Amino acid sequence: MAKLAFYTFAALEEAFRHQHSRGFVDRITGVFESAEQASGFVGRADSARHEGQDAQWGDPLATPRFNARQRDARRDNSPEVSPDDHEAPTLSLWDDLESVYAFAYYGRHAEALKKREDWFVKPEWPSFVAWWVENGQIPTWEDACSRLELLNNEGPTPHAFDF
């Protein structure tokens, strides 16, 4: 049975370590824990900022091409701040669309989602993309970026869609 790959991408206005981002950073662990306990959750790639990145998920530093344009919109664009200090991607695997929808719009994640404008640059792209993968297949960060770009450029297709 196929599984649903789900990728989110957002750009923080300030770096993770900046006080402005504290409200978001303080919620990360709780939101990840609630995802891992959610019905239909299969697994997730660790962020590039965490030790023990599992290589089967691909290069955790992959980023959508259109993100470079958004870097200029951030307040903290000093040269000593790495671009990935602002990027907040997630990549996960779910049993079905209904499960990830329930996680995204109810509970801890929904609470954080309501405050996203406090922390993130308003995107000019879709904030997430979903696509089906064969059972046993692990989606990669690179594929996720390509799927988000496809959704951005062509709208929903069977290969890249939203809710």
List the model feature ranges, each with a label.
Residues 1-87, 99, 126-163:
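Short S/T/G/P-rich N-terminal loop/turn motif that feeds into the first structured element of a domain
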Residues 91-92:
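Ligand-binding pocket scaffold of soluble enzyme catalytic domains
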Residues 97-106:
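Short amphipathic alpha-helices within nucleic acid-binding modules
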Residues 106-126, 132-133:
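An exposed acidic His-Trp-rich patch
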